[in-house]
């Protein structure tokens, strides 16, 4: 069943332009599902939500959930500004994390020093994982603000 969910998410996220992008989006989706204690279908609903969730983002967030996506976009941008990542790799970077599900889910992203010395772009991997973890936790914390009327929101109205 787990394999099916991962495969289904990869297919659903096939808008991504490379295998690495799909892998990164699947990783992010797994964090969202774990920390939010939600299923695969609910996890996919964030794509295209409001003005900032999904590809692109502009205007003013429609609610706290959408604000999580704006903060996520800004976090990726900050990783680039700080020289940790190249802009072309933010959505294609795969990373490692530890997950504990005893009780409720908790995620600990690997820090730069946790990676083997031969692994390239460790600072980027650590930064992107932390951006994804924070966004997933933000989604979980703000799940009560999630409003179905903002699904597949017309971004040109933002």
From Swiss-Prot:
EC number: 3.1.1.4
Molecular functions per Gene Ontology: calcium ion binding; calcium-dependent phospholipase A2 activity; phospholipid binding; toxin activity
InterPro entries assigned: PLipase_A2 (IPR001211), PLipase_A2_dom (IPR016090), PLipase_A2_dom_sf (IPR036444), PLipase_A2_His_AS (IPR033113)
UniProt key word Cell division: no
Signal sequence coordinates: 1-16
Cofactor binding: number and manner: Binds 1 Ca(2+) ion per subunit.
Enzyme class: hydrolase
Superkingdom to which the source organism belongs: Eukaryota
Biological processes per GO annotation: arachidonate secretion; killing of cells of another organism; lipid catabolic process; phospholipid metabolic process
Tissue-specific expression: Expressed by the venom gland.
Transmembrane segments annotated in the record for this chain: none
Disulfide pattern: 51-158, 53-69, 68-138, 75-131, 85-124, 109-129
Cofactor: Ca(2+)
Subunit structure: Monomer.
Family, as annotated: Belongs to the phospholipase A2 family. Group I subfamily.
General function of this protein: Starfish phospholipase A2 (PLA2) that has hemorrhagic and capillary permeability-increasing activities and hence is considered to be deeply involved in the local inflammation. Shows hemolytic activity only in the presence of phosphatidylcholine (PC). PLA2 catalyzes the calcium-dependent hydrolysis of the 2-acyl groups in 3-sn-phosphoglycerides.
Protein name: Phospholipase A2 AP-PLA2-II
Taxonomic classification: Eukaryota, Metazoa, Echinodermata, Eleutherozoa, Asterozoa
């Amino acid at each position: 069943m787990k394999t099916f969910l991962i495969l289904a998410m990869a297919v659903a996220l096939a808008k991504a332009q490379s295998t690495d992008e799909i892998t990164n989006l699947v990783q992010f989706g797994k964090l969202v599902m774990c920390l939010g204690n939600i299923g695969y279908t609910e996890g996919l609903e964030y794509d295209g939500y409001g003005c900032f969730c999904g590809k692109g983002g502009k205007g003013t967030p429609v609610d706290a959930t959408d604000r999580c996506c704006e903060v996520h976009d800004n976090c990726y941008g900050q990783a680039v500004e700080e020289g940790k990542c190249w802009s072309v790799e933010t959505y294609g970077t795969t990373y490692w994390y530890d997950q504990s599900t005893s009780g409720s889910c908790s995620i600990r992203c690997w820090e730069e020093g946790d990676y083997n010395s031969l692994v390239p772009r460790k600072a980027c991997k650590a930064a992107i994982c932390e951006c994804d973890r924070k966004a997933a936790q933000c989604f979980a914390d703000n799940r009560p603000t999630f409003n179905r009327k903002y699904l597949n929101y017309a971004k040109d109205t933002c």
